[in-house]
Amino acid sequence: MTVQTSKNPQVDIAEDNAFFPSEYSLSQYTSPVSDLDGVDYPKPYRGKHKILVIAADERYLPTDNGKLFSTGNHPIETLLPLYHLHAAGFEFEVATISGLMTKFEYWAMPHKDEKVMPFFEQHKSLFRNPKKLADVVASLNADSEYAAIFVPGGHGALIGLPESQDVAAALQWAIKNDRFVISLCHGPAAFLALRHSDNPLNGY
């Protein structure tokens, strides 16, 4: 007998008119185990520089039909890049615009992954107790110990980050000081924060 899963969005009872992806979508586009691979860095970095993660701190994304999408940073698009960077020798710090905890799309968490989940548990406190991005920006200078800024994916990156002057200032600092800027999927929406001033990414 074929069991059909519902294609109707699932209600998020924590907020009015808010929804998670349907059971069908989750069955097709998420997995309890990630495809983590290639984590072999025989000569990892041993220096003082680290990664600044600019994470999402908002849960609900308004949609065109008036409903709210219950979102955040996508776990795979956050944790797998960080797993690789950490294995390559880089520690990381997490910051959000508000200084409040990172929001994740927990419905996409690879909860049976024997490598990713221990890594997440090991670093969960960084996501639960992030720095306030404005405080980080205020301390940035040419000698700051960040090798890169990483903006994870997930629809949560669409909320607040594209309008944030602090995000713009952090990106301006990274580009001016020849640091790496890393992002994927919806994360580059944060780069729109640069549009309100001289945009070094204009034309890309």
Predicted regions and their residues:
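Extended, subdomain-level signal for the structured scaffold at the beginning of enzyme domains
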Residues: 1-177, 190-204
